[in-house]
Amino acid sequence: MNKTLKFNAPATCFEESLLLGNGFLGAAVYGGIEVERYSMNEATLWTGFPKDAPNPDGKEALKKAQGLIADGKHTEAAEVLEQGFSGDFSQTYLPLCSIYIDCGITEYDTYSRTLDMEKGVLKVNYTDGDTSVSRESFISNPHRVMVVKIKQTGVPLTQIYIKSELYHCVFTHEDKLILRGTAPYYDHPTGRRYFTNKHPFYYEDDAKKGMKYKGVLKVEHNGELRFNGDIMEILNADEITVYFAAKTSFNGFEKHPYLEGAEIENAVDEILQKAINKGYNALKKAHIDDFSSLFGRTDFSLRNNKTDLYTDKILKEHKSNALYELLFNVGKYLTISASREGGQAMNLQGIWNEHIAPPWNSNYTININTEMNYMPTTALNLPECFEPYVKFAEELAINGRKIAEEWYGVKGVISHHNSDIWRIANPVGNKCKGTHVWSFYNTSFGWILWGLVEKFRMENDVEYLKNTLYPLLTECAETYIALFTEDEKGNLYLSPATSPENQFILEDGTPIGIAKYSAMNNAICRDILKSAVEFAEILGDDANCQRYKKYLEKIMPYEITSDGRILEWDKEYTEQDIHHRHVSHLYGLHPAREITPYSTPELAKAAKTSLNVRGDEGTGWCIAWKANMWARLFDGNRALKLLDNQLTFVKPNENKNISILSGGTYPNMLCAHPPFQIDGNFGATSAIIEMLVQCNGNDIYILPALPDKWESGEIKGIRINGGAFIDIKWEKGKKADVKITPEEKAHNYNLIFKH
C-alpha cells in the first residue's frame, strides 16, 4: 500500500520533480535548497485561437486518392492526400510561469522530499546546522488556488519572484506580485516551428492576438515585507504562507480568446481573496477531504511490498512488489491531479509542461495517446475525472461534423490524428511531404467513443446513454456507413486507410503509409456498429438496430498472414519496421473485446503471434498497451514482463533525443517515451486492473492474468460492468475471496475464476 513518493535530494530537472494539480493549475515542484521552483501551468493556456478549416477541393482529392489506391498507385495517392487533403497543424500547450522562493541556504545536513499521493500534499524539509526550512504545498480543487506553507528558522531574508518565457510583465501592487501576459499566435505554415529570440510569433493586430493570462501571488507572514523591483522580499519571518491563483481568457473552444475572452482581472483576485479569507487550515482540510475522497475509492496491495528505500532507489533495484503498487497509485494520483470536472481533458503531458516548444506540441494525439490517458478512469470509479474527456468528445464532434461535410461530403462526425484546445478535427500536415503516414488516420473519433461506451457499460446510466453517448455513436456510425467502399465479394471497408504511423515497403522500395484498407479501421468500424446495435436495442430504436446489423455483418473480416499473424493491411506487404511501436491492428484485442481466447481462439492465437513478432520493446505507452493485450490473452507473466520493461529506470537528460524503442520510467515515476509522455502511466494502471479483473458483458473474469510473482494481494473498489464494484483478495495464487457491491441498477453476474 505504497502511496508516497520520497526522495533524499532536490530535483535537478523536471523528470525528478514532484507534481501537484487540481485539474486547472499544475505545478512541478523541485524541492530546491537555496531556491525552490514551482513550474506552473494553467490548463487552458494554449497558443492560437479557433479557426475554420475550409477545403473546397477536399472531396475531389479524396475521390482521386480512392481511385489511385484501388489501382495500386500508393505513392500517387499519398501525394494527393498530402497536397489536397491536409490542413493546419495543431496549436501548442504552454507553460505559464515559474515561481521561485529563495531562502539563501546553499548546503544541507538533512533533507527529505515527499509527496503523499493519498492526500495530494507535498512536503520538503531540510536543515543546515541551526537553520531549518519546511515547505508544505498543495493545489486545491475546491478553492482553485495553490498554497505553500513555509516554516523556517535562521533565515533572515526570503525572496519570491516570478519568471515566464512568454510575453509578460510582472509588477507589484500592495502586497502582491501580479503576472500578466498574452500567449502567441503560433502558426505552422510549413510544419516547422519559428522563433524570434526563443519566442513564437506575436502580432499587434487584435484579431491575431492569443490568449490573455493573469496570475496573482500574495503572502501572509510574521516578518517585514518590502519590494526590490519585481522581487518580493520578506525579512525575519519564521512563517510564510504563499497563495497563488491564475486564469486565462479562454472562453470556450469556439470563441476568440482575445476578442471574446473571459474576464480575468477581477476573477483571479476573487479566487485569491476567497481562499485567503478561508485561512490555511480550512483550505488544507477542504483539499485533503476532496482529494482523499477520490483517491480512497480504490486500493491495490501485494505481499512482499515492504521497503524503506527512496523512490528512485526502489525503481533502480526493482526487488519489491512495492514498485507495482506505486505504479498503480501514480496513475490514479495523476488522474485526480490533472483531470477534474469542468476542466480540460489531459493532453500528452497531462497538465504539466515547462517547455515553450514541447514535444509534439503537448497536444491531443488521438490515435492512442489521449484515449490511453483515460483507460483506467472509469474502472477507478472516478467519474468526476472522466467528465473532461466526455466534454472533449462532445466539443470535438462539433468541428468533426464540419470536417465530415466539407472535406468528405457526408453527414456525420469525423476526426483525425491531432486536436488541441480549439478542437481541430481536420487532417493536419499543411502539404508537407511524408505526413500522410499519420495525419490521414480518420477513425480516431470511433476510438475516442470507446471510452464513453465503457463508461455506460460500467455505470449503466440510461439517461447518459440516451442523451450523450447514443447520439455521438450513431453519428459516428453513419459517417463510416457513408464512407464505406464495397468490394466484389460484398465486404465493406474505409479506403484509403492508415494503420497509425506505420508503413510498408512497395516493390520499388518506397515506404508508404496508406493502403486499400487496414485491420484497425475495420475493427473500429465493427466496434462502433456493434455498440450501436447493442444500444439501439436498449433504447428501442429498432429501425436503426436492424440497419446497423446489416452493415455490421458485411465489414471486412480479419485475415491471417502466412506466418500466422493478424494481417495489418489489405495484403502481405514487406513491413518497414516489424517491431513498430503501434500495434493498431490488434485494436480488436484491446481496447475492444472482439478478439478473446474464449470466443475467437484462432484470432487470439494470431494476435499472440503478432505480439511475439512485434516484441516487448517500445515507447512507454507502447509497452503499457502491450501489457494490456497480454492480460487480455490471460498471460499474466508476460504482462508483468512488459510492466517490468516499463519500470526500467531512465536517467533524465541522458539522451535528449526522442526514442521509439527505449520506454521506461523516470525517477519521479513518470512515463518515459522518452521524452516524458504521461499516457504510459495510465496505460500501466489499466494493465494492472486488466490482470486482476476483466468484464465481458455479464461475465466477470477473476484473476484472469495473475502473474506468479503476485502470490498474494488485494484489489478493492474497482468498477465493473452493470453498475457494481468488486473487491478481490487472493492468497498463494489460488484462493480468492470476491465481494461485489451492486448499485441500484446492477446486473446478475457469471464469475469465472481463471487462475
Predicted features by range, described:
Residues M1-H436, E454-F456, T474-A477, L529, ...:
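Aromatic-residue-lined binding/catalytic grooves and analogous aromatic/hydrophobic interfacial grooves
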Residues W360-Y364, T377, C432-T443, E459-P471, ...:
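Alpha-helix capping and helix-loop boundary segments enriched in small/acidic/polar residues
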Residues I368-T378, N442-V453, M520-K530, S584-R593, ...:
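Well-ordered alpha-helical segments within folded domains of soluble proteins
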Residues V462, K466-L483, R526, W630-Q646:
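Extended amphipathic alpha-helical segments enriched in small hydrophobics
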Residues E475-F535:
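Acidic/histidine-rich catalytic neighborhood
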